[in-house]
Amino acid sequence: MMLLTELGAATSIFLIAHIIISTLISKTTGRHLPPGPRGWPVIGALPLLGAMPHVSLAKMAKKYGAIMYLKVGTCGMAVASTPDAAKAFLKTLDINFSNRPPNAGATHLAYNAQDMVFAHYGPRWKLLRKLSNLHMLGGKALENWANVRANELGHMLKSMSDMSREGQRVVVAEMLTFAMANMIGQVMLSKRVFVDKGVEVNEFKDMVVELMTIAGYFNIGDFIPCLAWMDLQGIEKRMKRLHKKFDALLTKMFDEHKATTYERKGKPDFLDVVMENGDNSEGERLSTTNIKALLLNLFTAGTDTSSSAIEWALAEMMKNPAILKKAQAEMDQVIGRNRRLLESDIPNLPYLRAICKETFRKHPSTPLNLPRISNEPCIVDGYYIPKNTRLSVNIWAIGRDPQVWENPLEFNPERFLSGRNSKIDPRGNDFELIPFGAGRRICAGTRMGIVMVEYILGTLVHSFDWKLPSEVIELNMEEAFGLALQKAVPLEAMVTPRLQLDVYVP
């Protein structure tokens, strides 16, 4: 609604600028573009996106098909809404769509795209990706900090047990942010970044949520560059203010870490390794800005996307108690009630893994994936896609497509336990389920995300019974759109320990 109001107020400005701008728009006369809505002069389809663009685009796809083309402001945008369409763009034409389009988020939040998420596909991006995979996110590196995850979960279980004894409710997002930020902090900086839950961790969570929210907005200035200076929605002002907060926090972490280098002699952490190996054979060397931008990526994406998936999964199980009970029964049979769940137990818990896949399907953390842009014109399924066309893959729509999934609005983990669906893997090769994207620009933290969701969710379900606070009549399952898909109303719950009491002592 706010976007429509702002667009309406600016219509006269757009129309005056139309004649000038239209001469700058590249023509595709005679080319067979994909179908799509016509939109308005200059502003194009921007008003059609509404407050929930992933939902609006899914509705449009029912009319226009698997591949759509929209004029959004002065920019062309292709939207893929089926597994085959996603595969065509992200696998067959992966290299042509390996870059990110310029946008205010990259400029004002990500240190002018000096990070890993928004960086140009080239030597610096490859170096950032290589270091992250080798020393934190990849298979062997991930195994090396399994004890950190286990220890931090021990602290979380103790805290939740204490809250249960005192009759306090658990705010799930706050609890998860505290634990996951401390996990990542220990790997990257050799320290827990938060000692106690309270104002500091809540401020950090609010900052992360705001970043993910405003970075996901369809910013008018990104699509009509000549109007960017006006900042009609106030988005860039918010981004700059938020960046100052994050930069102050990251600079403090960076400086404190440098001052204690001698204490880690012989036991380097992730930041030590990045600073020591921040160059490559192509002459690329990471600056302090690059390193801070990388820390920003890992802290924000590492805490928000996984915590969001876990929160959605718990909410679905509380709404469907039979699923919760079945998951607990599986764990009781495999693990018992006299010890905690271990990461090594997870391969023996197919129902838990099915719950995680079903959550990735119905509530993907990034509903529209991160946008890409075409380096050259290309043909997709017979349609012409011009150079510099932005690409959005509607992961949310794919997960709710009745042509792909039976009863897609139903939360049903059973669908992943038998038949072809039991072989579907969320790591980017099965395009029916691509919560982390696919291709070269797939989320660098895919492995870590899956491990964190399965392990933390499994531990929470095994360790506690869950119910809503007494005054909550019905669980709110509405979404809040952003770069990551949050619950509109954060989940709060009353928990009761279900294992023997010494398990909750870290």
Curated annotation (Swiss-Prot):
UniProt-listed GO biological process terms: anthocyanin-containing compound biosynthetic process
Keywords of the record: Endoplasmic reticulum, Heme, Iron, Metal-binding, Microsome, Monooxygenase, NADP, Oxidoreductase
EC number, as in UniProt: 1.14.14.81
Keyword Heme: yes
CDD domains per UniProt: CYP75
Residues the record lists as binding heme: 443
InterPro entries according to UniProt: Cyt_P450, Cyt_P450_CS, Cyt_P450_E_grp-I, Cyt_P450_sf
Biological role stated in the UniProt entry: Catalyzes the 3'5'-hydroxylation of naringenin and eriodictyol to form 5,7,3,'4',5'-pentahydroxyflavanone and 3',5'-hydroxylation of dihydrokaempferol and dihydroquercetin to form dihydromyricetin.
Name this polypeptide is given: Flavonoid 3',5'-hydroxylase 1
Source organism: Petunia hybrida (Petunia)
Gene: CYP75A1
